[in-house]
Amino acid sequence: MDRERTCAVPDLGPEVYSRWRASEIGATTERLESQLVLELVGNVGGRKVLDVGCGDGELALELAKRGAVVTGIDASAAMIDAAKRRAVQHNADIMFQVATAQQIPFAAEQFDVVTAITVLCFVEDASPVFREIARVLRPGGRLIIGELGKWSSWAAGRRIRAWLGSRLWRQGRFRTAHELCGLAGQAGLMVESVRGAIYYPRWGFATRLLSPCDSALGRLTTFGAGFMALSAVKPAR
């Protein structure tokens, strides 16, 4: 992968997603992250939604079930193939195609909502991604960015794995809530809120003990959050 994520992220294929969701901690973490993202997305019935970095289509499918007209893009052909299979299995009408976050292949002001979940953590320069998202959003449209938190036990573990030679996490880029807000503002978007999730360490007993408190903590601070979600809108004319 080059510095702008113009190709697929190594070591991160559909089978990795499947194994993660099959684990206890993975299932709980995925549920809490999805709850936060969907809460910030709000009502999508009849709206055109673009899921940037759609992966294997899990979020795109949930948005389609809620009545959205969904398009998903991802730099990985393997992920897009998996997303298409998922849509067929659930009889969902979703358009998927291979494309990068830096060059979204759609005309300006096409979408009411854009989601981009754990995309920027593999992009060194996130500014072009925010500009592209702002370009394809309609005035009044909403962006939901979901990212890995910079100051958390999860991020510390990923840094250690990078130091030990992980190809995946050597490319990881962790940003603060302040940095994400700045990037959104530079792209002409108005930040509505930033919320945190996943405050427990990556241990099964800690997940069971602390996950019930996650939503309340996420409304108070993003410090210590393994995951953050930002909601921003494109000003109406």
Located regions from the model:
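Acceptor-substrate binding/catalytic loop of class I
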Residues: 162-179
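Short catalytic micro-motifs in class I SAM-dependent methyltransferases
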Residues: 118-121
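Conserved class I S-adenosyl-L-methionine
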Residues: 1-44, 58, 62, 82, 142-166, ...
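A conserved beta-strand element that flanks and buttresses the S-adenosyl-L-methionine
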Residues: 115
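Class I SAM-dependent methyltransferase SAM/SAH-binding core
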Residues: 50, 56-103
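A short glycine-rich, Lys/Arg-flanked "PGG" loop and its adjoining helix->strand segment in the class I
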Residues: 127-139
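A C-terminal cap/extension of S-adenosyl-L-methionine-dependent methyltransferases
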Residues: 192-237
